[in-house]
Swiss-Prot record:
Organism taxonomic ancestry: Eukaryota, Viridiplantae, Streptophyta, Embryophyta, Tracheophyta
Free-text function comment from the UniProt entry: Component of RNA polymerase I core factor complex that acts as a GTF2B/TFIIB-like factor and plays a key role in multiple steps during transcription initiation such as pre-initiation complex (PIC) assembly and postpolymerase recruitment events in polymerase I (Pol I) transcription. Binds rDNA promoters and plays a role in Pol I recruitment.
Binding sites annotated in the UniProt record for Zn(2+): C21, C24, C42, C45
Name of the protein: TATA box-binding protein-associated factor RNA polymerase I subunit B
Membership in a protein family: Belongs to the RRN7/TAF1B family.
Zinc finger (RRN7-type): 19-51
GO molecular function, one term: zinc ion binding
Gene Ontology CC, one term: RNA polymerase I core factor complex
């Protein structure tokens, strides 16, 4: 091996490179061939090493004897200090980014940490890391807005608003505060003083400057991620869509970010293309700076957007109830012309506070409040108050279930004497069918091929492989594609044989699943009723028998019942059938939506009671005034 001392040390005496992970503390021995583009990856947590501890020695750093004893014998003279790397190009914060074709990659692999003086003093390191981090987040936000406009049909107004919100958010976070660097250095000094007591003299001599440099870098990065989290770009996108009155929900943003349709998980690869290589002006790579550990949930995303609006002093409107409710009704295949006007009246009448964004992560999301208003409107319009409508549907199926050619419950003939009951029956049947059609799963989870492609393009993007590994991956891909074609042919044949043997006997039960032959051997209505009871128990509900008579015309408020030492919700079957497709579409638990419905109904009842009292008071005042104006008879 020809080496003049400028590269990595070779393996002499069976030794290697001992690296200790900065994240999990796991140490392991590495060889030169284990490096990936000059970087070593932790075998415990897959983090990339930026600081190293070299336990091997380079024999070319010492004078060679004829017997080459210096490579095997402990040197008596002190180890010479290696020369620091030259200052990187484009170190100034105001330097222009290089062209895309000439990224200015370093000529030597960074398999060891840079020298103590390579990046200057800690103040310069903090300025470089901060400038690179803020510019990189702005690039990611720009890519996300482009994807929203081009792929998801978001108006250009949202993109223009996002720029203003982002600048105000950066200013409010005080990330460019002059005292920030001094605070971080003071924290780093206190941490080093705590560790200095446990260090011996030998450990202080081995790479102490490099460890101090690395600790400064990651201390700055942790502070920046607390002030400007990576997920704040998603929150700014949603906040801009909310202000622009778009129908984009937090669930949409999170799903697109998870599936790679919105640049987030793999967006760090685009930062280097626009800003150049991070090794030129920052000691940390783009993967370390902008790679998120996880995708934030929809609940936390809405709270983050509300927190940003609160910190920048932005007065927010309520959600665009009309368009969002119209979208939900369309996805559930419900009559928009009949339901939406009544829902809008309830919205204008109640105006619940949950329709505004909040920074409280424990509050119910705004989309749940929209769903609650729609459910209350449906209960008022169709009279779904536990009268046993679903049980009557099950009895109808039981009566016609013995005839294989009987029509499905969706096409039950209406009763001329009771059209309202028919409307409610059709509503529940439509909701039961829509519950099966709602698909809240990710696209990459539908088949193995899409999942493997997702892992290649999103999860493991930015990782390089050797030629042998790439060739091996291509072989495995070809083998998988061949087996996939064979499996598709076999599945098609099995489906055709199954259709011929069953001859169309399988029917869809009211709970949304297909009943097999064993289920259909029992009465069809009992099968559907027992299935819905089991589903209610799984979701924390207790089935209640239908009401025999209506006690009052007010709202039906359900209470909780104690069962096995815990409180569970009680509900009728028809109300649960109405509740669960809305909860699935909003991607929340059924109990959360049920609690929101009860809260809204209590608020409406309180408003109606106050209005009734006010009207009675006005009527009494009017009568008293009329009596006073009446002339006194002689």
């Amino acid at each position: 091996m020809d080496d003049d001392g400028g590269g990595s040390p070779g393996h002499y005496g069976g030794g290697g490179i001992h690296l200790v992970c900065e994240y999990c503390g796991h140490g392991s021995e590495y060889a030169e061939d284990d490096a990936d583009n000059g970087f070593f990856t932790c075998r415990q947590c897959s983090a990339i090493h930026t600081s190293t501890q070299n336990t091997a020695t380079n024999p070319f750093d010492f004078p060679m004897t004829p017997a080459h004893l210096s490579a095997h014998r402990r040197p008596t003279q002190p180890t010479p200090t290696p020369k620091p790397f030259p200052a990187p190009r484009g170190a100034a914060t105001g330097a222009a980014a290089p062209d895309f074709d000439d990224l200015g990659e370093p000529s030597e692999p960074r398999d060891f940490a840079t020298g103590a003086n390579a990046w200057g003093n800690p103040e310069d390191v903090a300025a470089r890391v901060r400038w690179r981090y803020v510019r990189g987040l702005q690039v990611i936000l720009q890519r996300q807005l482009e994807a929203l406009v081009e792929r998801h049909r978001v108006g250009s107004l949202a993109a223009s608003l996002a720029g203003t919100i982002w600048l105000r958010w950066v200013a409010a976070s005080k990330v460019f505060d002059e005292m920030w660097v001094h605070k971080m250095l003071a924290i780093a000094a206190s941490v080093e003083e705590g560790h200095s007591a446990s260090k011996d003299k030998q450990s202080e001599l081995e790479g102490d400057a490099q460890k101090s440099q690395s600790s400064y870098e990651f201390l700055f990065l942790r502070s920046l991620r607390m002030m400007l989290p990576v997920y704040s770009t998603l929150a700014v996108c949603f906040l801009a869509c909310h202000v622009a009155r778009e129908t984009i929900l937090p669930t949409d943003i999170c799903r697109w970010a998870m599936e790679g349709k919105l640049p987030y998980v793999a967006a760090f690869t685009q930062v280097d293309k626009l800003l150049g290589s991070s090794l030129n002006d920052c000691p940390l790579s783009s993967r370390q700076l902008f790679r998120p550990t996880r995708v934030i949930g929809a609940w936390q995303l809405e709270a983050a957007a509300g927190s940003i609006a609160q910190k920048i002093g932005l007065l927010l409107p309520s959600v665009n109830f009309y368009l969002i409710a119209q979208r939900f009704l369309k996805e559930l295949s419900l009559p928009i012309e009949k339901i939406l006007p009544h829902a809008c009246r309830i919205y204008e009448w109640a105006m619940p506070a949950e329709l505004w964004l909040s920074s409280n992560p424990g509050r119910v999301p705004s989309r749940v409040c929209v769903m609650a208003i729609l459910i209350v409107a449906l209960r008022v319009l169709y009279g779904i108050n536990g009268q046993g409508i679903w049980e009557s549907i099950a009895q109808t199926e039981n009566a016609v279930g013995s005839d294989p050619e009987a029509s499905a419950p969706h096409s039950i003939e209406p009763d001329s004497n009771n059209s309202e009951e028919f409307d409610a029956r059709e509503l529940l049947c439509t909701l039961a069918a829509s519950y099966d059609k709602i698909d809240v799963g990710h696209d990459y989870s539908k088949e193995v091929h899409s999942y493997l492609k997702y892992c290649k393009d999103v999860v493991f993007t930015g990782m390089t492989f050797s030629l042998e590994e790439e060739h091996l991956i291509d072989i495995f891909w070809d083998m998988y594609k061949g087996k996939e074609v064979m499996l598709l042919d076999e599945n098609a044949k099995l489906c055709q044989e199954k259709l011929r043997t069953t001859n169309g006997v399988n029917k869809r039960c009211r709970d949304g699943r297909f009943a097999d032959t064993k289920c259909c051997s029992t009465p069809l209505g009992n099968c559907a009723l027992q299935s819905i009871k089991s589903k209610m128990e799984e979701n924390g509900f207790c089935y209640v028998s239908p009401r025999k008579r209506l006690v009052s015309d007010g709202y039906l408020l359900y209470t909780r019942r104690e069962s096995s030492g815990s409180l569970i919700y009680v509900a009728h079957a028809d109300y649960y059938i109405l509740l669960r497709p809305f909860a699935k579409l909003a991607e929340v638990d059924v109990r959360v939506l049920h609690s929101s419905v009860l809260k809204l109904e209590r608020r409406l009842g309180w408003i109606e009671e106050r209005v009734g009292r006010s009207l009675n008071t006005l009527q009494n005042l009017h009568d008293e005034a009329s009596d006073d104006e009446r002339p006194v008879s002689d």
